[in-house]
From Swiss-Prot:
UniProt xrefs under InterPro entries: Ribosomal_Su5_D2-typ_SF (IPR020568), Ribosomal_uS9 (IPR000754), Ribosomal_uS9_bac/plastid (IPR023035), Ribosomal_uS9_CS (IPR020574), Ribsml_uS5_D2-typ_fold_subgr (IPR014721)
Composition skew (Basic and acidic residues), residue ranges: 102-113
SUPFAM superfamilies tied to this protein: Ribosomal protein S5 domain 2-like
A molecular-function term among this protein's GO annotations: structural constituent of ribosome
Keywords: Ribonucleoprotein, Ribosomal protein
Native source organism of the sequence: Gloeobacter violaceus (strain ATCC 29082 / PCC 7421)
Pfam family, one: Ribosomal_S9
The protein, known as: Small ribosomal subunit protein uS9
Residue stretches of biased makeup (Basic residues): 114-133
Length: 133
C-alpha cells in the first residue's frame, strides 16, 4: 500500500460486536483481524454476502480492499457490524453513495440486543413454574 492511497474509515456496531472498517483501493479482498474474510466467518456464505452487501449495492465489490478489526459478540453480530461499518465508510468515500445505501437500510444501526435478566425470573422473561397449591 502506498503512502498517499486514500483510506476511508467506518465504525459499525451490532449486539455486542464492534467493527472498525478501512476501505483501501484494491481488488476486493476482505481481511478480518488479519485472517481472510471467508475463513474468519467460518466459510458461511450468507454471512459473507451480508457483510459485503453495501459494496454489491453500489457495484464496487472488486474496487476496494476491506480491512476490519472486529471485537465482541459472535460471528453473526460481527458480520452485521462489518456491514454497517462498510456502509459508513462508503458514505465517507462519496456523499452520492448515501441515498442508495439509506434506501436499502444499510445505514441504520440495528438496536436489537439481548434483554437483561430480571430477578425472580429464570431468564429475561421465563418465569419459574407456577404451582397453584
Amino acid at each position: 500500500m502506498s503512502q498517499n492511497a486514500a483510506v476511508y474509515w467506518g465504525t459499525g456496531r451490532r449486539k455486542c460486536a464492534i467493527a472498525r472498517v478501512r476501505l483501501v483501493p484494491g481488488s476486493g479482498e476482505l481481511v478480518i483481524n488479519g485472517r481472510p474474510g471467508d475463513e474468519y466467518l467460518h466459510f458461511r456464505q450468507p454471512l459473507m454476502s451480508l457483510a459485503k452487501a453495501p459494496l454489491e449495492t453500489l457495484g464496487l465489490e472488486n474496487q476496494y480492499n476491506i480491512i476490519v478489526n472486529a471485537s465482541g459478540g459472535g460471528v453473526a453480530g460481527q458480520a452485521g457490524a462489518i456491514r454497517l461499518g462498510i456502509a459508513r465508510a462508503l458514505c465517507e468515500l462519496s456523499p452520492d453513495n448515501r441515498r442508495p445505501l439509506k434506501v436499502e437500510g444499510y445505514l441504520s444501526r440495528d438496536p436489537r440486543a439481548k434483554e437483561r435478566r430480571k430477578y425472580g425470573l429464570k431468564k429475561a422473561r421465563k418465569a419459574p413454574q407456577f404451582s397453584k397449591r
